[in-house]
Amino acid sequence: VKQDVTKILIENKKAIGVQLKNGQQILAKTIVSNADPSITYLNLIGKEHLSKGLVKKLKKTKYSVTSLILFLTLDMDVTQFGIDSGNIWMMKDENDDANFDELMNGNITEGDSFPAVFISCTTMKDPVSFNGRYHNFEVITYINYDSLPEFNGIEDYHSEDYKIFKEKISAKLMNNLEKIIPGAKQNVVQIELGTPK
């Protein structure tokens, strides 16, 4: 069940649960966060619960290469396009260094597609997970962490600007996918973009 966590609850210097956006508190013995360390510690736990040394270290942390991951379910027979359990590395050309430089230095919201993506059909890799109709994909590209727009605070990640950003990036990744699976856009059942922020 997808829930928006706004706070990790701390009692006697120990994480004891989480608080949801609706105010509900869920207590637990173990709390797991898959957010960046700075988001987990500074935004969800809060500086007031951290040592000065940890706060200083978090503020000095320089993120470098990261990735954007499009999680996708398609309602179509993708085998007709040669999709199997193999991985697909799609590059706009053979110059890996130039593609990498473009990903690291460009504005990630500009353009129609990315110069390099990795595509994997998880239902072909794990046939037991295939229900006979829907295929799941992961479409991944790498980017410079600093090229991500700055969204401050938990609320910004539910703002209209953040949704527009995610839609632009998802559309670009779908354009990459369409090059090997024509008609993919018309057969999307579920789509979600994972970002490092």
Segments the model singles out, each with a brief description of its role:
Residues V1-Q3:
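Short loop/edge segments at beta-strand edges and connector loops
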